[in-house]
Swiss-Prot record:
Reactions catalysed according to its record: Deacetylation of xylans and xylo-oligosaccharides; Endohydrolysis of (1->4)-beta-D-xylosidic linkages in xylans
Claim: Secreted is one of the keywords in the record: yes
Active-site residue list: S152, E555, E648
Name this polypeptide is given: Bifunctional acetylxylan esterase/xylanase XynS20E
Keywords, in A-Z order: Carbohydrate metabolism, Glycoprotein, Glycosidase, Hydrolase, Polysaccharide degradation, Repeat, Secreted, Signal, Xylan degradation
Pfam families: Abhydrolase_2, CBM_10, Glyco_hydro_11
Similarity remark: In the N-terminal section; belongs to the axeA family. In the C-terminal section; belongs to the glycosyl hydrolase 11 (cellulase G) family.
EC number in record: 3.1.1.72, 3.2.1.8
PROSITE patterns per record: CBM10, GH11_1, GH11_3
Record-annotated CBM10 domain positions: 335-374, 383-422
Functional summary from the UniProt entry: Bifunctional acetylxylan esterase/xylanase involved in the hydrolysis of xylan, a major structural heterogeneous polysaccharide found in plant biomass representing the second most abundant polysaccharide in the biosphere, after cellulose. Degrades xylan from acetylxylan, beechwood, birchwood, and oat spelt, and releases acetate from 4-methylumbelliferyl acetate and beta-D-xylose tetraacetate. No activity is observed against carboxy methyl cellulose, beta-glucan, p-nitrophenol acetate, p-nitrophenol laurate, p-nitrophenol myristate, p-nitrophenol, palmitate, or beta-naphthol acetate.
Thermal dependence of activity, per record: Optimum temperature is 58 degrees Celsius for acetylxylan esterase activity, and 49 degrees Celsius for endo-1,4-beta-xylanase activity.
GO CC annotation, single: extracellular region
Length: 671
């Protein structure tokens, strides 16, 4: 009998004293606390705020925020053995996050045996799949952003679901419940966030490493974890977060170790879980897949929209309490009138400007107010398409600029067009965000390189690793394997071709003599246009600016795009400084110390990264602005050795192939 097999297997796993019976206490019966994390009831709604439904034959408790947007995510939270949805809800309170983050929560009821889960067969995976379909019909959820988290036996089922319905679940967060079948194979590499307490006397903590290793091996994750001690879990100051990745398909496995926690669900973990799972869709990271809030940008990039929508789906300012993110651009602070506040709009934070009024001066687009806290603009004409007018939007008056971003840098605001009729534009230099497909973006010399980029001048084709120079333009091709080549032109443009390379890079730009700092050289900018062709099997990638300094020895990256399907993440550096507005766009800054090959041989050196939050294929990079931001953070720059436009791609398995063409690439200095 299937249930008997499953329960006997579970009994073996419990602890060194697992000969004891599977009583209710061991499985988190409501009176069982275990450790210091059991109550979880820090406010929030009660089960009476939920809608109780019959979900494909068994009841489910559903919570949906009153202002739920279309294409919002779904999270399913599963109780432990011999428990019920009421107990799971009263300990986790997922609805408190659902209100602020905008997603649907479902608490299903277990139905196999003693309110347990079928962790070996298909009965309950089919039922969960039917619940997802039901939520699509009732709430129009985004079926690519469905997340599964379960406690105890619900956690065991969460692992089991990886082998059955990974095509319907984007990310998995088991809590205090390992996979009882150990090496059960997942249908695909999936993101995993496992939470477990060290004082768990039901499912012993010492078993966790072995269970997680099965999946790390399956997904070909790095053997060593990035370890963060004193991780700030809400209830546990002594938590430790372990991160393995990137693994196959760019996924990560994370484990939150809670010192002293027993065998209990807790609301203290839900923010950590949500922050992880919400980064993913079934197709990969949210930022790479384009799924995410249902934003619809105007369809004609040249006449009123960029067409680069990232699916961020933000409909409120980054900081709802102040209306701004604090990264002010130094502009004037617009005062809020009572007419604005009584309508429920937020005032701008200090040092932020109101730039997102429409052309007739109303706040937002007839409804919303937005604050601009980074002077992030897109240079383009104010012409209007019929498509824009049909949606009821205003055209920008003559002399105004279209602003396509909200304050946190995401493209579009639910498809709305914005006009900036004040400050904020310049057609030269850095700080302007050019649209990837171009709407007349002008480079430093007045060239419309986003639309008209093409290679010109003398060229040299390289088919093996080489550092060289062509009429004053420095270049390099390097690869560790495969059949690779690159063509470099003396106008700075270049084209990179790689076949079956484990790691490949090519770059072109300025070389220096390591005698002057960037301040002594002058203000450094770069302009680039990227065209991707037939890119395959890329696990990690950087497109942007690359270079070195000496004294101190620093390898630096400004990453504006990537050839992989996902944005470079926390794995690039062991110190994350945070998110900053640099040159008019949002970047995440990392710092790292490593030993390895460098321009001075194998030695210790620093690595600095700025990773753009939204990729672009064309634009101007204010390199000096990144140097200055790094220095504010205590990241010392040395004497400049080089600054070049970079295309780099790598694969953890099988090699990567494709072409990254840069028909326009230029690094230059303005004094």
């Amino acid at each position: 009998m299937r249930l008997g097999v499953a329960l006997s297997t579970i009994a073996v796993l419990l602890t060194a004293t697992s000969a004891r019976n599977l009583d209710k206490r061991q499985w988190g019966w409501p009176n069982f606390g275990g450790g210091n994390g059991g109550n979880g009831g820090n406010g929030g709604k009660t089960i009476n705020d939920y809608k109780r439904e019959q979900g494909a034959g068994r009841d489910i408790h559903v919570y949906a925020p009153s202002n739920l947007a279309p294409n919002s995510p779904l999270l399913l939270s599963l109780h432990g053995m011999d428990q019920d949805p009421n107990y799971q809800q009263s300990n986790t309170h997922w609805e408190t996050l659902a209100d602020s983050e905008g997603f649907v929560v479902v608490y299903p009821r277990g139905g196999t045996g003693m309110s347990t889960w079928d962790i070996q067969g298909t009965k309950d995976t089919q039922w969960v799949s039917q619940i997802i379909d039901q939520m699509k019909k009732e709430y129009n959820i985004d079926t690519k952003r469905v997340y599964l988290s379960g406690f105890s036996m619900g956690g065991m089922f969460t692992y089991h679901a990886m082998s059955q319905i990974a095509n319907k679940i984007a990310a998995f967060a088991p809590c205090s419940g390992p996979n009882v079948f150990g090496a059960s194979k997942a249908q695909r590499p999936v993101p995993i966030f496992h939470v477990h307490g060290t004082n768990d006397d039901v499912l012993n903590y010492q078993q966790v490493e072995g269970f997680l290793k099965n999946y790390r091996d399956q997904f070909h994750c790095p053997s060593q974890a990035d370890t963060k001690t004193n991780y700030p879990n809400r209830e546990n100051p002594n938590a430790t977060l372990y991160t393995w990745g990137p693994c196959d398909k760019g996924v990560y496995i994370k484990h939150l170790k809670l010192q002293g926690r027993g065998h209990s669900p807790s609301s203290a973990d839900i923010q950590d879980i949500w922050d992880f799972v919400s980064q993913w869709t079934v197709d990969g990271p949210v930022s790479a897949s384009g799924n995410g809030g249902g934003n619809t940008t105007p369809t004609n990039p040249s006449t009123g929209g960029n067409g680069n929508g990232n699916g961020g789906g933000n409909t409120t300012p980054t900081n709802p309490s102040t209306g701004g993110n604090g990264n002010g651009n130094g502009g004037s602070t617009d005062k809020c009138s009572s007419n604005i506040t009584k309508q429920g709009y937020k005032c701008c934070a200090s040092n932020c400007e109101v730039v997102y009024t429409d052309s007739d001066g109303d706040w937002g687009v007839e409804n919303d107010q937005w604050c601009g806290c980074g002077n992030r603009v897109t240079v383009g004409s104010g012409t209007c398409s019929a498509k824009i007018l049909q949606q009821g939007y205003k055209c920008c008056p003559s002399g105004c600029i279209i602003y396509y971003t909200d304050e946190d840098g995401t493209w579009g605001v639910n498809g709305e067009e914005w006009c900036g009729c004040g400050s904020g534009s310049s057609s030269t230099g850095g700080g302007n965000d050019a649209p990837s497909s171009g709407s007349g973006y002008q480079g430093a010399n007045g060239t419309n390189f986003c639309n008209n980029a093409k290679h010109s001048g003398e060229s040299v084709t390289v088919t093996s690793n080489k550092v060289g120079d062509i009429n004053g333009i420095g270049y390099e091709l390097w690869a560790d394997s495969g059949n690779n080549s690159a063509t470099f032109y003396d106008d700075g443009s270049f084209s990179c071709s790689f076949q079956r390379a484990k790691d490949y890079l090519c770059r072109s730009g300025l070389s220096f003599d390591s005698t002057k700092t960037h301040k002594q050289i002058g203000h450094i900018y770069a302009e680039f246009k990227l065209v991707k062709q037939n890119i395959q099997n890329v696990d990690y990638s950087y497109v942007g600016i690359y270079g070195w300094t000496r004294n101190p020895l620093v390898e630096f990256y400004v990453v504006d795009n990537w050839l992989s399907q996902w944005r470079p993440g926390d794995w690039v550096g062991n110190k994350k400084h945070g998110d900053f507005t640099i040159g008019g766009a949002q970047y995440t800054v990392y710092e790292n110390t490593r030993y390895g090959p460098s321009i001075d041989g194998d030695t210790n050196f620093k690595q600095y990264f700025s990773i753009r939050q939204q990729p672009r294929d064309c634009g101007t990079i204010d390199i000096t602005a990144h140097f200055e931001q790094w220095e504010k953070l205590g990241m010392t720059m040395g004497k400049m050795h080089e600054a070049k436009v970079l295309g780099e791609a790598g694969s953890n398995n099988g090699g990567t192939s494709g072409t990254a063409d840069f028909p326009f690439a230029k690094v230059y200095v303005k004094n």
